[in-house]
């Protein structure tokens, strides 16, 4: 059983591409248009964001070295703060993984409507999305090697237009176009940078991917830290070079209303055929990242089920070590949410749910930063000041992202935390049939 499972584990390059693919996902293709409302000054926002994202990646890299247990943030929170915060972390992250997939598949299939206009019909779009979601559930059931190979190909395809614009877009870059829209936000310098951060801070969600999937990675103590930092660096370079190039290619007024900035830039430079290729690559990038996020949903639930914090069904695995039942449950839940979003009234509510689910990932990030301070105590050696600085930067990065969120999103995130508290109590009672030990001594640690 163990040797069969080891044979299905993945190496450094596929897991690095999974990290970068999960980070960039679908958002990279809309970033230039989103940042156009601020202008070229967004470059400063990128610099701040990249510092924070690298800090967070270093936190996860060090944590995965100190504790290579599968589950990522869940494993760290449970070890350092006990089963309650471990349970809370896992539920939040598990929800974020599969809810985010629903928004991502809509964007990916939407890009395919460039080739198949029938996909613009809401019913056809929804049915296609459900089919695509199940394809990636089934690919995950085949095994982690299969899904990381698929995502590696998808990430490479997605990188074609991104790297193409990042490298060759500069031949069509015009400094006057870029500087003419240096700051069109109507805010001062600090305010403009803050408005940029509200967009860019979210662009590195997924930095934890390798640590969550440590259970299916070869030599996780070595490969997970390298893949984490490497994936962030790949995403950072692609983000900055490509978005900056496009902001100097397309006039700000046109860029603000662009539904496909990369496609528009490619058409401007090389014609309609190039635009079609970019649309295909964008669809591949969006849909390919579904595989990685579905993998994480299955692995984080399995890690919690192995510890008794999730129902045992999530821990059932096949010969390849794949949590088949847990993945099928995720597939059913994604199908229900996808079908419910077909209603125009439900679409708005689902948009709120998607935004809240992104905040769900920030709570595990914060717990991981705190866990490093605890678990790393006495293990940093002479690098202690450096790690304290890095952890502080990562912590502030997460706090700033929460502050930049909408009030309604933060409120519903807090409500979810309260519901999870009650769920933990019910789960505890399910696992422990004896009365709660009222005379248990209070720990003085």
Swiss-Prot record:
Residues binding agmatine, per UniProt: 23, 96-97, 101, 104, 203, 205, 293
One Gene Ontology biological process: cellular stress response to acidic pH
Compartmental location: Cell inner membrane
pH dependence: Optimum pH is 2.5 for Arg-Agm exchange.
Domain of life: Bacteria
InterPro entries per UniProt: AA/rel_permease1, APC_superfamily
Site (Cytoplasmic (distal) gate): 93, 208, 365
Residues marked Middle gate (site): 293
Assigned GO CC terms: plasma membrane
Cytoplasmic side: 1-11, 63-83, 143-145, 205-222, 302-324, 371-384, 428-445
Induction, as annotated: By acidic conditions, a monocistronic operon (at protein level).
Consequences of knocking out this gene: Loss of arginine-dependent acid resistance. No coupled transport of arginine and agmatine. No effect on levels of AdiA.
Site positions (Periplasmic (proximal) gate): 202
Keyword Cytoplasm assigned: no
Function: Major component of the acid-resistance (AR) system allowing enteric pathogens to survive the acidic environment in the stomach. Exchanges extracellular arginine for its intracellular decarboxylation product agmatine (Agm) thereby expelling intracellular protons. Probably undergoes several conformational states in order to translocate the substrate across the membrane; keeps the substrate accessible to only 1 side of the membrane at a time by opening and closing 3 membrane-internal gates.
Quaternary data: Homodimer; each subunit has its own individual transport capacity.
Protein name, UniProt field: Arginine/agmatine antiporter
Organism: Escherichia coli (strain K12)
Gene label: adiC
